Amino acid sequence: MAETKTKVTLVGTVLAKPGTEFVYEGESPECETCKVKKACNNLNRGHRYRIITVRSTHHDCAVHLNGATAVEVMEAPVTMLISADMAMINSKIKVEFSCNKTECRSYSLCRPDGVVEGEKYVVADVLGNASDICGKGRALKLVEIRPA
């Protein structure tokens, strides 16, 4: 599978460390008048990113206490549980969150941060069976997915 391209964006200076992962939540109201807001808000809302490289460029920021620093990011893989019949390496899946059992121990793996419902992803790796039995009786596999 081809490597994901990197993208330059701005993040809070405190977070600007290689390997740090974050989920982009979108533009804040404080960004409205910022002259560099396009550089900060150039990612896909709800997607998980990993910082690859930290650059030396720094800007004052109304959102981040210590300002914002330029970084190179790539979309990070996400580990989640999916139906066993969809868990095939390199297969494309459309994520649909069909379970609302928030008390389930596997809930955070069935509905992980950084995955957008309705979007398509590629199964990059099948990591194994679910560690817990699904409360809805479904056969689940633990997989690593990337945006399609």
Swiss-Prot record:
Q: Give the protein family.
A: Belongs to the UPF0179 family.
**Which superkingdom is the protein from?**
Archaea
Organism of this sequence: Methanoregula boonei (strain DSM 21154 / JCM 14090 / 6A8)
Pfam hit, one: UPF0179
Identify the InterPro entries for this entry: UPF0179 (IPR005369)
Protein name stated in the entry: UPF0179 protein Mboo_1959
